[in-house]
């Protein structure tokens, strides 16, 4: 069985050397990797370039969030990296700046709607007058208006996001869902998790599945188990 390009494995590991070792262990079972903030300060871009050179796809999950001018300058540099996906926060000014900077490059911009670790109670505590579902709906509509390529949301809001995108005439809109947990794994700190099959049926285009794979005794075997769950959907 070969890798499924819809499966993204996050390299949320302490060091770049740890990440390289994990990639080696996973071998041909995984073709798409996410590099997040943990590796940003320790040559994460060097790792990204090396993985791209070896034929892997790369998701830079850096969640850019700053004034428009700063986001635009940062995204313009990243657009030359050859990486495939970049996250920004789902605020109109931020999304517009990233889309402008991306230009004609192959980099696709994803807007982060609501973190999968947050509950409705958390949002109230943060001062939002929305449930997670309502806030995701608002941000998906804003993301479509700003011209980003897709969004990041929990599997529980994937069907809503897909419906909104289809109604807007954008069936190709990307929906990347973290918080994917196979039935045989623990949920960890994901408050709104779902199985790989359920997330895909809800309309997700890509799944981010981390600890069930990277913390397994045999990461390659765990990755192939997830790929098997995804097969045919």
From Swiss-Prot:
GO cellular component term, pick one: cytosol
Name its pathway. Answer: Pyrimidine metabolism; UMP biosynthesis via de novo pathway; UMP from orotate: step 2/2
Residues at the active site: 63 (proton donor)
Task: Name the domain of life this protein comes from.
Answer: Bacteria
Q: Does the keyword Lyase apply?
A: yes
Q: Which InterPro entries match?
A: Aldolase_TIM (IPR013785), OMPdecase (IPR014732), OMPdecase_AS (IPR018089), OMPdecase_bac (IPR047596), OMPdeCOase_dom (IPR001754), RibuloseP-bd_barrel (IPR011060)
Record keywords: Decarboxylase, Lyase, Pyrimidine biosynthesis
Give binding positions for substrate: 12, 34, 61-70, 116, 181, 190, 210-211
Q: Which reactions appear under catalytic activity for this entry?
A: orotidine 5'-phosphate + H(+) = UMP + CO2
* Family annotation (SUPFAM superfamilies): Ribulose-phoshate binding barrel
PROSITE patterns according to UniProt: OMPDECASE
- MF (Gene Ontology): orotidine-5'-phosphate decarboxylase activity
Q: EC number(s) in its UniProt entry? A: 4.1.1.23
One Pfam family recorded for the sequence: OMPdecase
Q: What's any GO biological process attached to this entry?
A: 'de novo' pyrimidine nucleobase biosynthetic process
Q: How does it assemble?
A: Homodimer.
Please give the family membership noted in the entry: Belongs to the OMP decarboxylase family. Type 1 subfamily.
Function, as annotated, reads: Catalyzes the decarboxylation of orotidine 5'-monophosphate (OMP) to uridine 5'-monophosphate (UMP).
This chain belongs to which protein, by name?
A: Orotidine 5'-phosphate decarboxylase
Native source organism of the sequence: Caulobacter vibrioides (strain NA1000 / CB15N)
What gene name does this entry carry?
pyrF
């Amino acid at each position: 069985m070969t890798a499924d390009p819809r499966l993204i494995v996050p390299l949320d590991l302490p060091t770049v050397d740890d990440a390289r070792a994990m990639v080696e262990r996973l071998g041909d079972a995984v073709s798409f990797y996410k590099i997040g903030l943990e590796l940003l300060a320790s040559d994460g871009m060097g790792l990204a370039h090396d993985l791209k050179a070896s034929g892997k796809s790369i998701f830079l999950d850096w969640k850019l969030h700053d004034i428009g001018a700063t986001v635009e300058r940062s995204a313009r540099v990243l657009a030359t990296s050859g990486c495939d996906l970049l996250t920004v926060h789902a605020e109109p000014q931020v999304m517009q700046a990233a889309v402008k900077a991306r230009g004609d490059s192959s980099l696709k911009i994803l807007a982060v709607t609501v973190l999968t670790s947050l509950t409705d109670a958390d949002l109230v505590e943060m001062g939002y007058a929305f449930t997670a579902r309502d806030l995701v709906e608002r941000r998906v509509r804003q993301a479509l208006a700003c011209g980003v390529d897709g969004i990041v949301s929990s599997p529980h809001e994937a069907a809503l996001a897909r419906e909104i995108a289809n109604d807007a005439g954008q069936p190709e809109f990307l929906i990347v869902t973290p918080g994917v947990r196979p039935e045989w794994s623990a949920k960890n700190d994901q408050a709104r998790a779902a199985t790989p099959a359920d997330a895909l049926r809800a309309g997700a285009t890509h799944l981010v599945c981390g600890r069930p794979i990277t913390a397994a005794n045999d990461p390659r075997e765990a990755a192939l188990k997830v790929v098997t769950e995804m097969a045919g959907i």
